[in-house]
Design a protein with these regions (language model features):
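Short, flexible loop segments at the rims of nucleotide/cofactor-binding pockets, characterized by
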Residues: 1-5, 48-51, 74-77, 186-189
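An N-terminal, well-structured beta->alpha segment
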Residues: 1-18
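Tandem CBS (Bateman) regulatory domains
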Residues: 156-185, 219-238
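Short acidic active-site motifs
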Residues: 8-12, 57-61, 197-198
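Internal alpha/beta core interface subdomains
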Residues: 142-144, 149-163
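Glycine-rich phosphate-binding loops that contact phosphosugars or nucleotide phosphates
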Residues: 22-28, 32-140, 144-149
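Short hydrophobic beta-strand segments in globular cytosolic domains
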Residues: 213, 218-219
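The conserved cystathionine-beta-synthase
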Residues: 188-206, 231
Length: 238
């Protein structure tokens, strides 16, 4: 795998980086699913991308492909019929085609403008049938491509935050204290409030404490523990 990332890989990174369009991933079966993941990784790290199912493409979805887009077609064998049907239309449209395959001598390998070689000696499947090793290698190649472009684009954590506002990653990068606060739920009493008013405010807001305000500024804090200690020391409280 390491040996397959060389000069052509650098050319592919530059081709995508300099492109004015998006990256369109295509494939079928398990290779198609890997294409979806690579498209998602590219999009979330600063390189606009989408996934186009090879079968759907020849049934109308080619309309989402622009001439300026770069195509990455994924097929272990390089001879999937759906890929063979699709590639001529993409070439006719003027798109640059990058083939990701374990078979450089295949249809895809020969028809591609650039090749991402993903060599596989044997699948992890005991019968050497189910795509396992091959899809892992494809995934690694896709991640290498995404991270290289991310670095080249100068993509920073603040950029990631803008397009990933949800989830734990989004919260870590994007969430601020102000996003979690609700002024209507903050317990607050004036400095002239009675003890009963303080107790009612703490009970209503259920935070175990209340801030004390004076002239619009916080002048103190009263907790339920403070109230208990006052009650223990004083018999007559108003």
């Amino acid at each position: 795998m390491e040996e397959s990332i060389g000069f052509d890989f650098e050319q592919i990174v530059q081709l995508i980086h300099q492109s004015q369009g998006k990256v369109v991933l295509t494939g079928v079966g398990k290779s198609g699913i890997i294409g979806m993941k690579i498209a998602a990784s590219l999009s979330s790290t600063g390189t606009p991308a989408l996934y186009l199912h090879a079968t759907d493409a020849t049934h109308g979805d080619l309309g989402m492909v622009e001439k300026k887009d770069v195509i990455i077609a994924i097929s272990k064998s390089g001879n999937s019929q759906e890929i063979k049907d699709l590639i001529p239309f993409l070439k006719n449209n003027g798109n640059k085609v990058i083939g990701m395959t374990a078979n450089p001598d295949s249809f895809l390998g020969k028809q591609s403008d650039h090749l991402l070689f993903t060599p596989v000696e044997k699948e992890a499947c005991p019968h050497n049938l189910a795509p396992t090793t091959s899809t892992t290698v494809q995934l690694v190649m896709g991640d290498a491509l995404a991270m290289s472009l991310m670095d080249l684009n100068g993509f920073q954590p603040q950029d990631f935050a803008q397009i990933h506002p949800s989830g734990s990653l989004g919260k870590k990068l994007h969430l601020k204290v102000v996003d979690l606060t609700d002024d209507s739920k903050i317990p607050s009493v004036s400095i002239e409030a009675s003890l009963k008013e303080v107790i009612c405010e703490i009970s209503e807001k259920r935070l175990g404490a209340t801030v004390v305000e004076y002239n619009g500024k916080i002048s103190g804090l009263v907790t339920d523990g403070d109230i208990r200690r006052v009650l223990e020391k004083n018999e007559n409280i108003s």
